[in-house]
Amino acid sequence: MNQFIKALYYDKKDPYIPEEYNFFGVFVGEWDIEWVDHLEVDEPRRVKGEWIFSWVLEGAAIQDVFIVPSRSERLQNKQPDAEYGTTLRIFNPKTSAWDIFYGCRGEAIRLTAYKVGQDIILTENTTEEMRYVFSEITSTSFKWRKELKNASGKWDVIAKVRAQRAKG
């Protein structure tokens, strides 16, 4: 298994990815997150999690592991819909976009990501009625939200994340 990790992990981006399309490089590292959902109720659910990003495949892609509740939090705060998933983001020079796969237990999603202003928008490929948005991105924090398109064509936020770069 050690050889698998050595073959997968890479410590920098491949130079073929133009710097202006290196949207996800800022996320490489470990993040402490707060997941917030059930936004329609008076007391939304808040759960501590972790999000870990790394260059992989000789720097041609960025992979993450999304864990809510976090590994330590799971011991005390079990959630019936806990998520332990991974995303693989590969830059596509033909489209100047990122081709993305997200998978966790019971779900597999294909998305495409573009930068719009300062935000990174990942749109689900089949119906285009769900998207994820990274915003307010700095080297030490970012926000993320999951949105669904409603009947009138507007986007409703159904979940949010606040992320702080992990210390240590």
Residue positions per predicted region:
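Hydrophobic small-molecule pocket/channel-lining residues, especially in calycin-type beta-barrels
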Residues: 1-168
